[in-house]
Amino acid sequence: MDLASRDSEAETVEQSSHSGAEQHSTKVLMLGALGVVYGDIGTSPIYAFREALHASPGIDTRAQVLGVLSLIVWALTIIVTIKYVAFVLRADNKGEGGTLSLMSLARTAYPKGARLILAIGLCGAALFFGDSIITPAISVLSAVEGLRVVTPTLDPYVVPITLLILAILFSVQRFGTGKVAAVFGPVTALWFLAIGVAGLYHLLDDPSILLAINPYYAVTYLASTPTAAFVTVGAVFLAVTGAEALYVDLGHFGRKPIVLAWFSVVFPCLLLNYFGQGAFVLANGGRPTNPFFQMLPDWALMPMVGLATAATVIASQAVISGAFSLTRQAVQLNLLPRIEVQHTSEMQLGQIYMPRINLLVALGVMLLVVGFGSSSSLASAYGISVTGEMLMTTILLFVVMRKLWKWRLAVALPLTLLFGIIDSGFFLANIVKIFEGGWVSITVACLMGLIMWTWIRGTRYLFDKTRRNEIPLDFLAANLLKKKPHLVPGTAVFLTSDPLSAPTALMHSLKHYKVLHEQNVILSVVTAPQPVVSDSDRVKMETVNDLFMRVTLTFGYMEQPNIPRALAICRKRGWKFDIMTTSFFLSRRSLKASPNSGMPVWQDRLFIGLARTAADATEYFQIPTGRVVEIGTQVAI
């Protein structure tokens, strides 16, 4: 009896310890999520309420203030709380989120609609790239503009200071964000606490502002002045920009910490600040130029400008990291050519740096800051890409609801229509700003969409053309077994995208050197529709005959391919792989445009240009350079 009670006590202590560790882990992840996930939406109060008020005509009346605030409250509730927190976050692809993850999930669930789903996914990804150059520009610029409230004499220095901060931000990317990321959470937590307290303090200026919780004021405002309200709706959307980050960063933190952080910290503090700004405007009358900073006491202005700048830099960092992550996914899914990837952490594989993407985003951001000069001007450019991306998410979510979750149409359709109508309304309200700055995000999105479409189309035509000219591997292997050429010791690995055909490098080797290795491996690398592939599913081996073997390596779209490490798994399957006796044969294609390619000449040239910029296969697949033999071939597409 005594032993049983001791065992019971020990079990209770163990369970308590496990529960405590789990709770601690959740709190740590919550803190991290505050910095990475909620940085963008958390800095929206700096400019969202101001822009929404300024979009409405004339002097701000009580009805206008309550109407605008009610629209913001219900936009946060329906789009973020209901759509993303309650539904979209459930659509994880093996724990990962984001447009391309959702696209892969939808394509797997509904193969018949694969092409249409791919097109929707491409649009969503292209729009994200448009967002990635606007977010750092408007966020940091809006924070530094707080200096104008401190003293108007600092106005000429706003743009130079913004450019300096952004230049430092992009220049330190190559060192990785691991060490700095440790302070992201605490700084952002302090930011939310500060904006919440500031809002709560001014809430007492006019407590009747809480009436804005009633959607009646939003509906009345929309109905009373439809034309002006339509423009205001486009500005109201600024309050929910960053909602997509909840889904994009799902794989970094998990659903539970993201949801808990939203309900316990982010949502309450955002509401308090927006209500505080509304009460401040009602109590003071007129039309404030910057209510977020103007409602602060003089002693708090400079500290808040500093904290706002830190918070917006963190928000920008999250978007830059997201651009790196999305680009890697696109490369793995063969939507873009290979791009150089540098790992900045030995512990966290997700922490990567892409020099070319970093440079392009930096140039885009700097040009926007110089060209537009103020966050108010940039606000017009901001909404289109984000609203478009959210609309793509809604469409893909419907496919997942119906085909993967097997929801009835009577349940899935009303929800999709609700989200779709709201997303479409915001999109249309922003599309009218296309000549005021919206053309920027549309141009970037169209350019990225064109690049991805050209790469997909070009690689498909190239694959079909080369396959028609290649000999079936089984036929060649059988003939070489009957009439063997001179055999040399060692193993030859031939990389190819088509494991059924004899690789070009193999044919050129036989033609010019008249020799064959004792063991020849036809190696192909494929990307799975899930983010990560376990080692047990990594390698597929197939013996063709005594001379040839097919090996297929599978990587998830979030993984960086490492061929030598993956081939080491083959030792457990019977193939004694030794890197020191293995030569890797790669075919380097020199492409030439052809009138019979199936694509217009301009697209041929664009595809050839993209192919030339592709990162070296040796480095990309992490093959030791001393073990590589490259054979050049010329191909007309």
From Swiss-Prot:
Keywords: Cell inner membrane, Cell membrane, Ion transport, Membrane, Potassium, Potassium transport, Symport, Transmembrane, Transmembrane helix, Transport. Residues 1-21 are annotated as: Disordered. InterPro entries: K+_transporter, K_trans_C, K_trans_N, Kup. The chain crosses the membrane at residues 29-49, 68-88, 116-136, 150-170, 180-200, 228-248, 258-278, 300-320, 359-379, 381-401, 409-429, 434-454. Its main location: membrane. The keyword Cytoplasm does not apply. It catalyses: K(+)(in) + H(+)(in) = K(+)(out) + H(+)(out). It holds the Pfam family K_trans_C. It is a multi-pass membrane protein. It is found in: Cell inner membrane. GO terms for cellular component: plasma membrane. It comes from the Bacteria. GO terms for molecular function: potassium ion transmembrane transporter activity; symporter activity. Belongs to the HAK/KUP transporter (TC 2.A.72) family. Transport of potassium into the cell. Likely operates as a K(+):H(+) symporter. This is Probable potassium transport system protein Kup 2.
